[in-house]
């Protein structure tokens, strides 16, 4: 089995990313290779950190649209009130002060692979970043939703932050006999266990709050549970059997946020108290400039995570 050691990692000098990297051999005249990392989530921040820890004099610049990162991991506990938003809000200060990573807040607009330049839109105008290696870890975007979906009315809460707070407030407003509807996107999507975990946490919340008769309906666009099927099947049919209804093969046909109604290939629901619609997903933002496959994601090497597009 091939061992991808530190030397191999540094040879790729930034080719490891959540989606893609565009490598170029660094000329002998360059003594301090420049790596630009787009996306300050777990993928991008980890790459930036370890390039500085292992890379000697590598210059690393991290680009993100936000001044800090709000973790999707554990955000379901914010929805149920078990954690505060501050507990999942992660700053970039340690990357800067401890690891020497430069940070630029802005939106990556365009990649010039021939010129090794990245255009970033910042509050002060566009900036051009020159690089020897580019790492793209931009997270996800949502595929267009059918019907009239307004996330400010029927939140996805699949990108943590204001959406998490909105869903939390809607859940807190539920009363006896109310219905919480959550959709599971068509695979592949980010964090396969996430929707099922959220359904279980919501069901337990409703139990603990004494919301008699309140239930959770899980509309899964897939033929079956996409992660830990044995555990979640037991959760749905035993632990939370009185509160969770699991519906597979429920491809979403239309969403109407104004009435909190949804039409699927398996069943239709009108006037849910909470409609947590999680759309189908694809590679985020600038990653699409590399070329995506039929599923909407970028093909990468399993050894280096370098793009195959």
Descriptions of predicted regions:
Residues 12, 137-138, 278-279:
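Short, well-ordered coil/turn residues at beta-beta hairpins
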Residues 98, 102-111, 115-118, 122, ...:
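A Rossmann-like FAD-binding core segment of flavoenzymes
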Residues 138-209:
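Glycine-rich dinucleotide-binding loop and its adjacent helix/turn
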Residues 1-20:
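N-terminal secretory signal peptides and thylakoid transit peptides that target proteins
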Residues 29-102, 186-227:
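Beta1-alpha1 glycine-rich phosphate/pyrophosphate-binding loop at the start
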Residues 149-176, 270-309:
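FAD-site-proximal beta/loop scaffold in flavoenzymes
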Residues 18-31:
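A short, basic/flexible loop-to-alpha-helix module at the beginning of a structural domain
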Residues 43, 139-142, 281-282:
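Short glycine-rich anion-binding loops that position phosphate/pyrophosphate groups of nucleotides
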């Amino acid at each position: 089995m091939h061992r991808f050691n530190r030397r191999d990692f540094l040879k790729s000098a930034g080719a490891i990313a959540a989606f893609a990297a565009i490598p170029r051999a660094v000329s002998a005249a360059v003594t301090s290779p420049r790596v630009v990392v787009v996306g300050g989530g777990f993928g991008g921040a980890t790459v930036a950190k370890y390039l500085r820890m292992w890379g000697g004099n590598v210059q690393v610049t991290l680009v993100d649209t936000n001044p800090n990162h709000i973790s999707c991991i554990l955000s379901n506990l914010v929805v149920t009130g078990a954690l505060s938003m501050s507990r999942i809000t992660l700053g970039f200060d340690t990357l800067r002060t401890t690891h020497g990573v430069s940070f630029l807040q802005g939106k990556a607009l365009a990649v010039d692979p021939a010129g090794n330049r990245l255009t970033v839109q910042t509050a002060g105008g566009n900036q051009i970043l020159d690089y020897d290696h580019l790492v793209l870890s931009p997270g996800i975007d949502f595929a267009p939703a059918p019907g009239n979906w307004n996330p400010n009315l029927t939140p996805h809460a699949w990108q943590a932050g204001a959406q998490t707070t909105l869903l939390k407030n809607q859940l807190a407003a539920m009363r006896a006999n109310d219905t919480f509807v959550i959709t599971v996107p068509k695979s592949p999507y980010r964090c396969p266990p996430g929707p099922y975990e959220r359904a279980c946490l919501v069901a337990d919340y409703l139990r603990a709050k004494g919301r008699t008769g309140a239930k959770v309906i899980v509309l899964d666009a897939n033929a079956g549970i996409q992660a830990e099927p044995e555990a979640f099947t037991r959760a749905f049919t035993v632990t939370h059997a009185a509160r969770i209804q699991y519906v597979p093969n429920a491809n979403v046909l239309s969403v109407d946020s104004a009435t909190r109604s949804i039409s699927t290939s398996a069943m239709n629901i009108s006037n849910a108290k909470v409609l947590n619609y999680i759309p189908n997903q694809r590679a985020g933002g600038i990653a699409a400039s590399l070329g995506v496959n039929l599923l909407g994601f970028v093909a990468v090497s399993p050894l280096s995570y370098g793009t195959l597009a």
